[in-house]
A protein has these predicted regions:
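Secreted/periplasmic carbohydrate-active enzymes, especially glycoside hydrolases
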Residues: 1-176
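Short gly/pro/ser/thr-enriched loop/turn and capping motifs at secondary-structure boundaries
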Residues: 183-185
């Protein structure tokens, strides 16, 4: 079992100007954790931030990272950073965007201080004739077609979105309301 599973990494934008990003990493055991951050989606680029810290006795680490001259994520410009987390011999990678969400009575919903009108659609987890299985290319196509039609938001109807669909939304600039389940408690 990997020391750091992707679902055990929480990334939060603390503020955008200057940009501070908090990484909360939950390892399976105490170890030294190294975090590297790079620009864009190409893994051959150099990582420009490297931080290391020893985890506590439960394997938990929190790192607050300042990102100089940060490029912000928005629906119109979905800029993503890459991260690589090393814990012992295990490596976990992924992407994240830096953005600030706010709501107020005058402007409504804002991304990075810019008023944003949601133009959304409810989508089901299936891919038509392909069925309910997740195919990354089909998920990307679904998001791309919605984006090209003028949508900037989706709500998953009755089931959670697949990881592939959420990743496509991050890359293409689609906001998501990810429904937990179609069930009353």
């Amino acid at each position: 079992k990997s020391a750091v599973e992707p679902e055990n990494i929480r990334i939060t934008t603390v503020k955008t100007s200057p940009a501070f990003v908090k990484f909360e990493i939950y390892a399976q055991a105490p170890c030294r954790i190294t975090l590297e951050i790079g620009h864009g989606l190409q893994d051959d680029e150099v990582y420009f931030i490297t931080e290391s810290k020893d985890s506590d006795e439960c394997g938990n680490v929190a790192l607050l990272i300042k990102v100089e001259n940060a490029r912000l994520w928005s629906a119109e410009n979905p800029y993503l950073y890459r991260y690589r987390i090393t814990a012992g011999a295990d490596v976990s990678t992924g992407t994240f965007g830096i953005r600030e969400l706010s709501w107020d009575a005058e402007k409504g919903f804002c991304i990075n201080g810019v008023r944003t009108i949601l133009k959304g659609a409810c989508i089901h987890h299936d891919n038509g004739l392909l069925g309910a299985c997740c195919y990354p290319d089909a998920e990307e196509r679904k998001v791309r077609l919605l984006k090209e039609t003028g949508y900037n938001a989706i709500r998953s109807a009755h089931n959670p979105c697949s990881k592939a669909l959420l990743d496509a939304c991050d890359r293409l600039g689609m906001l998501v309301l990810d429904e937990y389940t179609d069930m009353w408690y």
